[in-house]
């Protein structure tokens, strides 16, 4: 039933032509004045309440200090309403009890939904308000709850009905002879806050205006072209109108289904064309695909700079940020997500390397080189244990306690692009690390999360013999990137082992197709499965791979919308209201939601489909490639005033309401997030593959490289427990590097002032490393035979004047550390605990010296001996007995001419 306000008495001063008073600052007031204009109603805005409200047909009071509530003096307003007036107030406080009051809280997971039918909005329709501030009030008396807050699963509609726990969002409260509409949050904030879906929010404010004034609301007519925005030269377009009655238009319109009117197909010349329907206009551009795709790439490349994705180093030398988080703030901005992800680094690097060649853009190659250098030098794990060769996916490597899960999908992409960028040894180590954690039978990842503890406890051999559980053998989400890396390694080296492990896994997955584990959705799985199949077919021409690609193409075709995108289907969607917002999830709620995924689906389809056509020559792949790339070009955000988003894509796009919107159930990457990798880079890689005709995978190899055998030998030596002595040195930039079995690793971000020194701590199986930092203090780390490299730790506040010297003291099972302090004294500490337990600094006597001492362990005496020159030029010697140093002795008289 349609909810309508009953008629109420009006004062003699109020007439149908009386204006509406809008109280509040211009920006939030504009949301309501737009609704009033739409209804043909006059309004007057005030910063403060007028003294006399009796001359107004209604009063609207917007929140002027949101996200903080504003305390109002409502005495005059209360009198106006009780006398028969109608008023709307939002998110405010008063001391009289006229306005509902309640605890103010953030609606983190809850969203607003309609509880009754409103004009043009059905019950249970969702309005996403992005963690708004709200008052948790209680419905009292005869108040009617028009909209509620609650944890509801659904995209446009609360598909499981209202939740058990709700609180009001919009109330209709009888007061005396009048009515008060009260919103517990600032509904007027929907414009600045970018609330979605936009048309529904606009309609809600129009409904409020209609309820306040009794004005009949105009029908909400929608006019668009199909396809929208742009169409390729020589391809047709039609005009579409959604309306309950046939509209007046330039073109003849035919009702194709209730409420939908279409024109005949139009073939238009290149250029822009505008169609008018009543007082509404819609424009579509026509032009060549190559120009459109190139424009799309140019704008996406420019977005990286404009949005600050390279931090404060435009050459990429500090990396690239992950992107923008999902949680839109009160200013309508997305939080910057600075996480330095290796997969984002490498995908972005490849996109910029391709763009450097496409656009003669030398800076692109500089950015690519710097990003790949950071990944190879800073993120690859080189400690000689079961983590060897893997890449830390969330920034520079640190010690074992700080190492993240070595996710198989992230590591697959990083390894692939390391190979493509010319870092072949590093890439092959990444590939071998993935092979060692795969099933010996199927060649697929056993545990794609690859937690460090699992790898270290189980080891490579046990992992390879473990069963693959939970359908993880049938998910391209987790398996495809490693398969692509294997295939690329084969193309580079000719080593049959790489092709064999890739095809073993693909044979299994293709043989089970269309069965799949739906990590995100069936549509995303299809888009992700294509790329390794393309690579495998490229090298083998195996009919099974082509048939599987054709099947995937048929599925994608069945899910393709009129603008080219592939709708999400069969997803990991919350099965109840209670399950909403508690885990990673798809960005749609039910099959039929017109939503595409620009994080896990669309970009990967855009990447693979041009290659599928190039390698197979089958028209269906070209048609699908055109469709998905056309779609990406249409939905690319085009708003020059928005530096944060202009030129990029957000995760969820609703191609029916034509805006970025989707189910906001995903805890990590919701519908409004932006990723430099996974989304932007793969999208433009796909476009540039189309533009350049590049095959992506190398040609079939004609010779065999010896490098894979040497890489496997490194892993075999680690598995056998063979030792590999390490040396340490200072680079020109001050970073300390470790060289072990010819493999280099940068040790943290410490900048050293001198050369490192180290001693073997045999009882604990580690090397202890010390260096003077540019801060003048001594720093220590370790290389443990099992758990690997530690973090740098500063040893006290002592200021050094020279380099440290160290020696292992087997009599005490301790590392003895000596330095010359800035005070001229020699200072000592011992490392007596298993890990990091250094004693406090203590001076060795009271003499002053010119440099650090020479130190050795005297096996005959069982003590540590020290030799140093004091400031008088005398040769001084002492030794450490137990934990004490004997007095310095003068040995100068033993020196002869």
State each model region's role.
Residues 2-18, 153-242, 264, 270-272, ...:
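Extracellular ligand-binding/catalytic regions of CAZymes and related secreted enzymes
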Residues 21-99:
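Helical hinge/lid and interdomain linker segments adjacent to catalytic or ligand-binding clefts
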Residues 31, 107-181, 188-193:
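Catalytic beta-strand/loop cores that center a nucleophilic Ser/Cys/Thr
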Residues 66-137, 145:
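A glycine-rich, often tryptophan-bearing local segment used as a flexible ligand/cofactor-contacting loop or short
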Residues 218-220, 288-320, 417-420, 424-425, ...:
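Terminal, non-catalytic domain-edge segments
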Residues 285-344, 363-401, 429-464, 503, ...:
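Low-complexity, Ser/Thr/Pro/Gly-enriched N-terminal "stalk/linker" regions
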Residues 337-357, 399-422, 471-491, 521-538, ...:
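Well-ordered alpha-helical segments within folded domains of soluble proteins
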Residues 717, 721-897:
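A structural motif
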């Amino acid at each position: 039933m349609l909810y309508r306000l009953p008629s109420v008495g009006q004062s003699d001063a109020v007439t149908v032509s009386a204006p509406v008073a809008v109280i509040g600052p211009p920006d939030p007031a504009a949301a309501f004045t737009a609704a009033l204009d739409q209804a043909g109603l006059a309004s007057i805005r005030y910063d403060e309440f007028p003294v006399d409200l009796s001359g107004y047909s209604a009063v609207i009071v917007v929140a002027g200090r949101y996200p903080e509530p504003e305390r109002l003096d409502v005495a005059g307003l209360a009198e106006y309403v009780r006398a028969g007036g109608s008023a709307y107030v939002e998110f405010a406080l008063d001391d009289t009890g006229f306005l509902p009051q309640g605890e103010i809280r953030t609606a983190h997971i809850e969203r607003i939904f309609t509880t009754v039918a409103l004009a043009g909005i059905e019950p249970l329709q969702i309005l996403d308000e992005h963690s708004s501030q709200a008052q948790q009030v209680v419905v009292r008396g005869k108040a009617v709850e028009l909209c509620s807050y609650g944890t509801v699963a659904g995209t446009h509609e609360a598909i499981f009905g209202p939740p058990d726990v709700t609180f009001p969002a919009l109330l209709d409260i009888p007061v005396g002879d009048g009515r008060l509409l009260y919103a517990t949050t600032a509904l007027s904030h929907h414009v600045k806050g970018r609330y979605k879906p936009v048309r529904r929010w606009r309609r809600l404010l129009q409904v409020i205006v209609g309820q306040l004034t009794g004005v009949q609301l105009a029908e909400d007519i929608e006019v668009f072209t199909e396809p929208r925005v742009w169409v390729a030269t020589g391809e047709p377009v039609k005009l579409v109108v959604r309306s309950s009655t046939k509209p007046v238009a330039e073109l003849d319109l035919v009702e194709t289904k209730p409420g939908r009117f279409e024109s005949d197909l139009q073939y238009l010349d290149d250029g822009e064309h505008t169609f008018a329907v009543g007082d509404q206009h819609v424009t579509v551009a026509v032009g060549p695909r190559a120009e459109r795709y190139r424009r799309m790439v140019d704008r996406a490349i420019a977005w990286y700079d404009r949005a600050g994705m390279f931090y404060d180093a435009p050459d990429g030398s500090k990396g690239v940020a992950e992107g923008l988080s999902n949680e839109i703030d009160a200013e309508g901005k997305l939080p910057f997500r600075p996480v330095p992800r290796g997969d984002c680094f490498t995908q972005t690097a490849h996109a910029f390397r391709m763009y450097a060649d496409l656009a003669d853009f030398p800076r692109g190659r500089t950015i690519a080189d710097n990003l790949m250098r950071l990944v190879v030098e800073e993120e690859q794990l080189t400690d000689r244990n079961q983590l060897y060769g893997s890449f830390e996916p969330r920034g520079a490597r640190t010690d074992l306690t700080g190492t993240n899960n070595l996710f198989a999908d992230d590591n697959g992409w990083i390894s692939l692009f390391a190979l493509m960028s010319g870092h072949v040894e590093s890439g092959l180590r990444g590939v071998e690390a993935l092979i060692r954690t795969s099933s010996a039978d199927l060649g697929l990842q056993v545990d794609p999360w690859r937690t460090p503890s699992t790898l270290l406890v189980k080891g490579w051999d046990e992992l390879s013999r473990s069963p693959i559980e939970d359908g993880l053998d049938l998910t391209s989400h987790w398996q495809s990137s490693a398969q692509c890396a294997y295939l690329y390694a084969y193309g580079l080296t000719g080593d049959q082992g790489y092709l064999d492990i890739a095809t073993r896994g693909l044979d299994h997955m293709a043989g089970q197709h269309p069965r799949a584990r739906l990590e995100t959705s069936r549509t995303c799985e299809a888009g992700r499965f294509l790329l390794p199949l393309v690579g495998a077919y490229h090298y083998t021409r195996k009919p099974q791979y082509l048939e599987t690609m054709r099947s995937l193409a048929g599925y994608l075709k069945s899910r393709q919308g009129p603008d080219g995108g592939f709708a999400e289907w069969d997803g990991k969607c919350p099965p109840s209201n209670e399950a909403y917002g508690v885990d990673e999830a798809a960005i749609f709620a039910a099959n039929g939601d017109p939503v595409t995924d620009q994080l896990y689906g669309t970009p990967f389809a855009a990447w693979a489909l041009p290659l599928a056509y190039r390698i197979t020559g089958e028209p269906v792949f070209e048609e699908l490639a055109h469709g998905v790339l056309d779609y990406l070009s249409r939905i690319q955000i085009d708003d020059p005033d928005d530096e944060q988003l202009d030129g990029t894509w957000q995760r969820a796009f609703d191609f029916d309401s034509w805006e970025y919107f989707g189910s906001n159930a995903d805890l990590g990457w919701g519908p409004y997030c932006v990723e430099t990798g996974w989304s932007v880079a793969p999208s433009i890689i796909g476009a540039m593959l189309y533009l350049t005709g590049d095959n992506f995978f190398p040609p079939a190899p004609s010779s065999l490289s010896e490098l894979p055998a040497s890489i496997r030998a490194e892993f075999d030596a680690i598995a056998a427990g063979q030792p590999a002595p390490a040396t340490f040195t200072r680079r020109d930039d001050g970073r300390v590097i470790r060289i072990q079995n010819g493999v280099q690793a940068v040790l943290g971000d410490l900048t050293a002032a001198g050369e490192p020194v180290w001693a073997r701590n045999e009882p604990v199986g580690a090397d202890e490393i010390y260096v003077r930092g540019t801060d003048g203090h001594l720093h220590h780390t370790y290389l443990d035979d099992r758990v690997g490299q530690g973090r740098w730790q500063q040893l006290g506040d002592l200021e050094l004047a020279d380099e440290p010297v160290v020696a292992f003291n087997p009599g005490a099972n301790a590392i003895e550390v000596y330095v010359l302090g800035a005070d001229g004294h020699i200072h000592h500490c011992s490392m007596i605990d298993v890990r990091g337990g250094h004693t406090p600094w203590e001076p060795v006597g009271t003499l002053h010296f010119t440099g650090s001492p020479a130190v050795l362990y005297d096996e005959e005496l069982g003590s540590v001996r020290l030799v140093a020159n004091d400031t008088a030029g005398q040769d001084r010697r002492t030794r450490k007995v137990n934990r004490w140093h004997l007095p310095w002795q003068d040995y100068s008289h033993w020196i002869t001419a």
